[in-house]
Amino acid sequence: VRRIKRKLSVYRRYPRMSYRELYKPDEKPLAIMVPAWNETGVIGNMAELAATTLDYENYHIFVGTYPNDPDTQRDVDEVCARFPNVHKVVCARPGPTSKADCLNNVLDAITQFERSANFAFAGFILHDAEDVISPMELRLFNYLVERKDLIQIPVYPFEREWTHFTSMTYIDEFSELHGKDVPVREALAGQVPSAGVGTCFSRRAVTALLADGDGIAFDVQSLTEDYDIGFRLKEKGMTEIFVRFPVVDEAKEREQRKFLQHARTSNMICVREYFPDTFSTAVRQKSRWIIGIVFQGFKTHKWTSSLTLNYFLWRDRKGAISNFVSFLAMLVMIQLLLLLAYESLWPDAWHFLSIFSGSAWLMTLLWLNFGLMVNRIVQRVIFVTGYYGLTQGLLSV
């Protein structure tokens, strides 16, 4: 609905902004912060790829390492020797610590670097060691950072073979989250949760966070410090924006694409990375997200006076109920399927009374739930297909 409204109102009066506009502002100094623990063979390649492909000159990369992780330090040292704008930061405490603790050490090193170089960064960007950064990302941040305090771009996981079901669930989730949920959240509530990667903070925002935490910007007790920061900045009246900005010219419009893949969506300035591919790793990561957002978030961020923002807070926190209910529903479904198989395979089997017969209200409720489920499936297929093509869209079912 929002897209249709903008197409009928905004884009009829104003042409879509071209990516060439991003080249007009002077390049402001930007700092990229990358925490790294046990990232041997990864962080060096990431920093080198960024240093050689970013379409921007006035930036520095600060990689946070640990004193008890010499292999990662060695990787970073090799890149630092080749690129003077890549810097190694060694945290005060041995690892592993929380991501927030590492980022606080990196931010402290950036402050010292600013004093010694006698200049100030205009923006501070979060990335992980696995990220592939879009060449135009810094130009987009440079264009917006004077007017916005938190800028978030989409995250689109890399594809794997279709048999990698665990990893592929991230494709489904992020396609919907950053294609639908967060844009609507920003439009209605003006609040954008940071994804922890592809996030740029203005100098105003970082200064406010440092003042709020007595010199410590990121909450080291939080398992989801990125989610936490979005609310802290909103409470301070800072402006937050989620940006879906495509880099499309006439040549790219004519390029051969996957079936039903959208030209503008598939050429979005975004963050690409591989997500966990094993069940145990994915459970550990998603458990951290659930605990941080649902339980720690409920304790830290109270309900507000805004009904709209409270609605999105409820959507964040309903996982405390829905995750358990979904698990119980799955057990019930397995039980019903086993009973159905038992009654079908053995003619003389005991036939249990069905819970689905004799109630018009129950049947109506089941059909209503079925309709809602189909609606959710269709939405997921649409948003996955827009970036990845129809094959991935159908696999999301």
What are these regions, as identified by a protein language model?
Residues V1-P15, F383-Q392:
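Transmembrane-cytosolic junction motif
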Residues I4-R284:
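Internal catalytic domains of large membrane-associated glycosyltransferases
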Residues P25-P35, G41-V42, L307-A329:
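Loop-to-transmembrane boundary segments
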Residues I125, V197, I291, D316-R317:
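Interfacial transmembrane-helix starts/ends
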Residues E225-R244, A282-V294, K318-L336:
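P-loop NTPase catalytic cores that bind/hydrolyze ATP
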Residues M268, R272, P276-H301, Q392-V397:
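Membrane-proximal soluble regions of multi-pass membrane proteins
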Residues F295-S305, L309-F312, G319, E343:
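Pan-eukaryotic secretory-pathway lumenal catalytic ectodomains of glycan-active enzymes
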Residues K318-V397:
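Membrane-embedded multi-pass helical conduit in multi-pass membrane proteins
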